[in-house]
């Protein structure tokens, strides 16, 4: 694998010897110019240059739409086939008949799968910055199912309203019948679909590094440039972060499939480096994606599921609430909102939300809702900034090419 793409390295060396006005370009001046351009782009953010950022964001959208329109125009047969298939599906969906029961069942499953796969992609695709959808969506869903399972002594929640809302079935099980495996089985589809989405979201770094290696070009991607610098200074790396990155790179490069599987299975912030490494050393696509899919959708998801289920099991939650109440001085005041929140959840599970005391908004749920709103807004802002910086990069590349032709 290490020898893969040897010709690509030679081609890159040749391309680095660019000639400008009859003289070879000084590598240090080229690197300095790239650094200045990168700093200029990093300053194009909404809180520093709002008008320019919004202008570049709009222009980048227009450029992307133009590129996709051109691509679709050159693939008219595929577009026509897709439109015909879409017309058949729409007709099947709206025409009355005995098939509607199957259509509704397929629609329900499709929307469920698409929802969780989409959240998984958003979590790792890195559009500006990843949206932490496990903490915001999947983790709370698993926690809610866990708390409900112990309260209802069953996981056979009525559908509908499950999964949108969880209520106890009319006939619950006996105390102590809920097992760890039954809860794992209940949330398996949601967790696996989310894991598949995260695996799909890891593909951009792989394709970027692979395309750069095959073409010999050097993409202006910070993570990829950091990866190349790390390879150049591998022997002099001293700090822990650099050694950890080198360990991941060597594991993936030498072990291959099982190295990628190990990196994907263990929650770690360095997996993007594994994708870049696989692309750079031209690891076959199915070797990379297969190991990533198995690691993230099966092994890692079961680790995360078990952790959340154990953390939110009935006796652990009761112990945590009791521990909060034991804090000297402020314990009882901190314990009260947790107790109110848990009691409100129990009432909802047993159809008692409209009965008894008026339902005031608990500050825990209020804070979590606001946290979700803030993180989603930050995610949207990061996308706007990232796309605006992409357009600024287009301008810089055009100016550089004009300078070379003079």
Swiss-Prot record:
| One of the record's GO cellular component terms | autophagosome membrane
One GO molecular function term of this record is: phospholipid scramblase activity
Annotated positions of the N-acetylalanine modification: 2
Residues in the signal sequence: none
BP GO annotations:
autophagosome assembly; autophagosome membrane docking; autophagy; cell junction assembly; cell-cell adhesion; embryo implantation; lipoprotein transport; mitochondrion-endoplasmic reticulum membrane tethering
Taxonomy, superkingdom: Eukaryota
Q: Which residues lie on this side of the membrane: Extracellular?
A: 65-77, 131-250, 295-305, 385-406
Which reaction equations make up its catalytic activity? a 1,2-diacyl-sn-glycero-3-phospho-L-serine(in) = a 1,2-diacyl-sn-glycero-3-phospho-L-serine(out); cholesterol(in) = cholesterol(out); a 1,2-diacyl-sn-glycero-3-phosphocholine(in) = a 1,2-diacyl-sn-glycero-3-phosphocholine(out); a 1,2-diacyl-sn-glycero-3-phosphoethanolamine(in) = a 1,2-diacyl-sn-glycero-3-phosphoethanolamine(out)
Predominant location category: endoplasmic reticulum
Cite the record's Polar residues compositional bias ranges.
21-30
- Keyword presence, Transmembrane: yes
Where in the cell? Endoplasmic reticulum-Golgi intermediate compartment membrane; Cell membrane; Vacuole membrane; Endoplasmic reticulum membrane
Cytoplasmic face of the membrane: 2-43, 99-109, 272-273, 327-363
Bilayer topology: Multi-pass membrane protein
Q: List every stretch annotated VTT domain.
A: 173-316
Q: Which residues cross the membrane?
A: 44-64, 78-98, 110-130, 251-271, 274-294, 306-326, 364-384
What this chain does, per the record? Phospholipid scramblase involved in lipid homeostasis and membrane dynamics processes. Has phospholipid scramblase activity toward cholesterol and phosphatidylserine, as well as phosphatidylethanolamine and phosphatidylcholine. Required for autophagosome formation: participates in early stages of autophagosome biogenesis at the endoplasmic reticulum (ER) membrane by reequilibrating the leaflets of the ER as lipids are extracted by ATG2 (ATG2A or ATG2B) to mediate autophagosome assembly. Regulates ATP2A2 activity to control ER-isolation membrane contacts for autophagosome formation.
Family in the record: Belongs to the VMP1 family.
Domain remarks in the Swiss-Prot or TrEMBL record: The VTT domain was previously called the SNARE-assoc domain. As there is no evidence that this domain associates with SNARE proteins, it was renamed as VMP1, TMEM41, and TVP38 (VTT) domain.
Oligomer and partners: Interacts with BECN1. Interacts with TJP1. Interacts with TP53INP2. Interacts with TMEM41B. Interacts with ATP2A2, PLN and SLN; competes with PLN and SLN to prevent them from forming an inhibitory complex with ATP2A2. Interacts with ATG2A.
Protein name in UniProt: Vacuole membrane protein 1
Ranked from the top, the taxonomy reads: Eukaryota, Metazoa, Chordata, Craniata, Vertebrata
* Gene name for this UniProt entry: VMP1
């Amino acid at each position: 694998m290490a020898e893969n793409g040897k010709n690509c390295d030679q081609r890159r060396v040749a391309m680095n010897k660019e000639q400008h006005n009859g003289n070879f370009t000084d590598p240090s001046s080229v690197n300095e110019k790239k650094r200045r351009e990168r700093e200029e782009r990093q300053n194009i953010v909404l809180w520093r240059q709002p008008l320019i950022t919004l202008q570049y964001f709009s222009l980048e959208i227009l450029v992307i739409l133009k590129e996709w329109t051109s691509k679709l125009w050159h693939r008219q047969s595929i577009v026509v086939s897709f439109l015909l298939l879409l017309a058949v599906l729409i007709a099947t969906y709206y025409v009355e008949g005995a098939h509607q029961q199957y259509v509704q069942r397929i629609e329900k499953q499709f929307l469920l799968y698409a929802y969780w796969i989409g959240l998984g992609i958003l979590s790792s695709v890195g559009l500006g910055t990843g949206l932490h959808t496990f903490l915001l969506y999947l983790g709370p869903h698993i926690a809610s199912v866990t708390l409900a399972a112990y309260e209802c002594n069953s996981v056979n929640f009525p559908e509908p309203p499950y999964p949108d809302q969880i209520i106890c079935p009319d006939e619950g099980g006996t105390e102590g019948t809920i097992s760890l495996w039954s809860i794992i089985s209940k949330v398996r589809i949601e967790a696996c679909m989310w894991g598949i989405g995260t695996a799909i979201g890891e593909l951009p770094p792989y394709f970027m590094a692979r395309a750069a290696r095959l073409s010999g070009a050097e993409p202006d991607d910070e993570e990829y440039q950091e990866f190349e610098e790390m390879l150049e200074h591998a022997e002099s790396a001293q700090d822990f972060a650099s050694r950890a990155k080198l360990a991941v790179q060597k594991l993936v490069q030498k072990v291959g499939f099982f190295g990628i599987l190990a990196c994907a299975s263990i929650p770690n912030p360095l997996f993007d480096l594994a994708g870049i490494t696989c692309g750079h050393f031209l690891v076959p696509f199915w070797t990379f994606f297969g190991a990533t899919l198995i690691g993230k959708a099966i092994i890692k998801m079961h680790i995360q599921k078990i952790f959340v289920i154990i953390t939110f099991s009935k006796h652990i939650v009761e112990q945590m609430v009791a521990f909060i109440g034991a804090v000297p001085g402020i314990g009882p005041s901190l314990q009260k909102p947790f107790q109110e929140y848990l009691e409100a959840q129990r009432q909802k599970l047993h159809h008692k939300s409209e009965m008894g005391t008026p339902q005031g908004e608990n500050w825990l749920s209020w804070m979590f809702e606001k946290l979700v709103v803030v993180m989603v807004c930050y995610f949207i802002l990061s996308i706007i900034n990232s796309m605006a910086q992409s357009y600024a990069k287009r301008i810089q590349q055009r100016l550089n090419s004009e300078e070379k032709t003079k």
